[in-house]
Amino acid sequence: MNVKDVSQKSEQKMKKAIEAFQHEIASIRTGKATTALLDRVKVEAYGQTMPLRQVGNVGVSDIHTLLVQVWDKSMVAATEKAIRDANLGLNPAAEGQSIRVSIPPLTEERRKEFVKLTRKFGEDSKVSLRNHRRDMIQEIEKLEKEKAISEDDRNRGKKDADDLLHRFEKQVNELIAQKEKEIMEV
């Protein structure tokens, strides 16, 4: 194993951390309807708890409305209750075998809460990135102790680790700014 291998492995881990962050912020409400809003909703179905996507189809009806097509008519009430109880501030209304979820406009206070939540997720993501950088540096130092790489390679590896961290932290900051803009948009 050399510095390049360690660097590539760490870069893959950092990319996964960014993907996880993107997935987390996708479920934060903005003023618009997106199917990701209901990703975390769990429904009590058939004696177990399952994700909403396993009991129905979620789609966007218009900019302020989601439409959930429940596959089993007996699950409509449980699905409606799960959406209401998910603490997302949504108003589901059953219509036959489907549920119309109207997305009310966000209050200024609620927008600020969502911005804080976005920043918290961003900070958690940065901590994860820093941990991957630390692991990369430890692996490089271990290789140097085993005489598998030279001191120059170690220094280059540490610089690579710092460069990777800065690149991915910049990406997190850009994603945070973009999400904040979406949230604060009226």
From Swiss-Prot:
Keyword Protein biosynthesis assigned: yes
UniProt keyword annotations, A-Z: Cytoplasm, Protein biosynthesis
Subcellular location: Cytoplasm
Pfam families (alphabetical): RRF (PF01765)
Domain of life of the source: Bacteria
Predominant cellular place of this UniProt entry's protein: cytoplasm
Keyword Zinc: no
InterPro entries hit by this protein: Ribosome_recyc_fac (IPR002661), Ribosome_recyc_fac_dom (IPR023584), RRF_sf (IPR036191)
GO cellular component, one term: cytoplasm
Signal peptide extent: none
GO molecular function, one term: ribosomal large subunit binding
GO biological process: one example: translational termination
PANTHER family: MITOCHONDRIAL RIBOSOME RECYCLING FACTOR PSEUDO 1, RIBOSOME RECYCLING FACTOR
Job description of the protein: Responsible for the release of ribosomes from messenger RNA at the termination of protein biosynthesis. May increase the efficiency of translation by recycling ribosomes from one round of translation to another.
NCBIfam families: frr
Similarity comment: family membership: Belongs to the RRF family.
Protein name (record): Ribosome-recycling factor
Protein species of origin: Chlorobium luteolum (strain DSM 273 / BCRC 81028 / 2530)
